[in-house]
């Protein structure tokens, strides 16, 4: 999904500011020469401003907090199938491992956000400013690490090895059976029952009958679920990206017809408001807590964090997307990111902006229009909406049995 710079997109500047003080350094010669030189200097500064004003760093005057949630980088296949010609292929990174391409994707994304928020994010990394959370999957932890390498190259005082321009930055994660914030893999009985009911209903949809039959015949195994198509579609993509030639028979349904089932499978996990409460509620709760700290900060004492970073999966990006009341099908590419910005204006108070990049190649993110509030989205309105998605007691609503 690519976005053009039309009305629904947002341009931001990206180069260094012009030092206009230097434009006044005029040689002391005759008055005529001085006037000419002064005119040329003014023209030079004006032209310089006109050229660079389109590419100056992001205006951070009103920014108070930035929250970035991205999908991990390119990976190897998670699964195989019975007739897979590459079943015995030796993936150096292992199944589901982050590839070198994936590492570079997230490193470049980190550099993009470094440039994008050049006037907001401090040039030096300080732990008090930043919080980084990740899914406990290796590919997500590694993606977070390479993203941070691009976002925070070490300043001179932070260089601890002149041959390695990198600095360690802490990344926090929970075991998958406890994580209901980033990966959202902690078991939830109510969510599971509701999801399985929706999945069963989807699998009976007549529009998938031919697809299921065709894939079953050619994979040598039962393929009667959009979830199974989801896994197979991802396997084909990963094999293609690795330069492997997938079987000819896949051309009848891959990628287009399989993509529809794949995106439907992703959306099912957060299909309705109730499922979204379970899948996204704890994350929104953590975001809300940090937003509140920024809004209530009086200037006294330690300042609240100004940057939150999360490294997760495509299903998490889709769940967050759907929680924002978007029903359009979404296929987040590797490194796709959702960004929440908290702003403060004297005349408007606090308000929230949301942006989306569908991959790491996009230079300018698309600003999303939020259906549940006017533009700009006042903080109080944003809070009122997300509060409907935040459970008071997640485990109790899930009907999880206490240990």
Model-predicted segments: where are they?
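Signature for phosphate-centric chemistry
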Residues: 2-131, 135-403
């Amino acid at each position: 999904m690519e976005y053009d710079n039309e009305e629904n997109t947002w341009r931001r500047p990206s180069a260094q500011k012009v030092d206009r003080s230097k434009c006044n350094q005029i040689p002391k010669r005759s008055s005529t020469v001085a006037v000419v030189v002064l005119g040329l200097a003014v023209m030079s500064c004006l032209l310089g401003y006109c050229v660079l004003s389109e590419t100056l760093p992001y205006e951070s005057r009103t920014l108070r907090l930035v929250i970035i949630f991205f999908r991990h980088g390119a990976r190897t296949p998670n699964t195989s199938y019975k007739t897979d010609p590459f079943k015995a292929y030796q993936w150096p990174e292992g199944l589901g491992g982050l590839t070198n391409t994936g590492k570079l994707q997230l490193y470049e994304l980190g550099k993009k956000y470094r440039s994008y928020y050049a006037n907001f994010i401090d040039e030096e990394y300080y732990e008090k400013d930043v919080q980084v959370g990740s899914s406990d999957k290796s590919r997500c932890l590694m993606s977070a690490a390479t993203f941070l390498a691009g976002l925070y190259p070490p300043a001179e005082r932070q260089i601890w090895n002149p041959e390695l321009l990198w600095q360690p930055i802490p990344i926090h994660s929970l075991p998958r059976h406890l994580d209901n914030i980033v990966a959202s893999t902690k078991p939830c009985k109510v969510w599971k029952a509701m999801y399985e009911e929706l999945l069963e209903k989807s699998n009976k949809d007549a529009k998938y009958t031919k697809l299921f039959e065709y894939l079953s015949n050619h994979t040598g195994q039962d393929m009667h679920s959009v979830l199974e198509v989801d896994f197979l579609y991802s396997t084909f993509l990963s094999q293609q990206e690795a330069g492997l030639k997938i079987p000819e028979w896949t051309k009848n349904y891959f990628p287009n017809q399989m993509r529809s089932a794949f995106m439907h499978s992703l959306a099912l996990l957060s299909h309705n408001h109730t499922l979204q409460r379970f899948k996204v509620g704890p994350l929104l709760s953590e975001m809300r807590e940090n937003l509140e700290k920024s809004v209530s900060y009086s200037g006294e004492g330690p300042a609240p964090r100004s940057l939150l970073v999360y490294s997760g999966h495509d299903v998490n990006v889709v769940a967050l997307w759907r929680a924002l009341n978007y029903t359009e099908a979404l296929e987040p590419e590797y490194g796709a990111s959702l960004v929440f910005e908290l702003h403060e204006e004297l005349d408007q108070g606090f308000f929230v902006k949301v942006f989306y990049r569908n991959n790491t190649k996009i230079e300018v993110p698309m600003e999303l229009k939020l259906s549940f509030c006017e533009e700009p989205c006042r903080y109080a309105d944003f809070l009122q909406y997300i509060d409907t998605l935040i459970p008071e007691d997640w485990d109790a609503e899930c009907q999880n049995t206490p240990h």
